[in-house]
């Protein structure tokens, strides 16, 4: 999955960027207070994308 597609999915479901790390970005679900890191790679493995959504308590991306 493309990183930009995952970021769009997260933002559509109420997540926002909390801060930028050295090689990753931290996104937070403001409704639940949960956060997760998103690596800065062009491609993100489907398993990792599902894990990020699970951490943020969101449905898995399509």
Question: What residue ranges belong to the model's regions?
Answer:
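Major-groove DNA-recognition helix of helix-turn-helix-type DNA-binding domains
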Residues: 13-29
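C-terminal structural segments of small proteins and small subunits
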Residues: 13, 30-62
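Polyanion-binding surface elements
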Residues: 1-14
């Amino acid at each position: 999955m493309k990183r930009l597609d995952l970021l769009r999915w997260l933002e559509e479901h109420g997540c926002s960027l909390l801060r930028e790390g050295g090689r990753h970005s931290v996104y937070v679900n403001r409704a639940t207070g949960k956060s997760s890191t998103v690596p800065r790679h062009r491609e993100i493995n489907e398993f990792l994308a599902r894990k990020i959504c699970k951490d943020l308590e969101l449905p898995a991306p399509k």
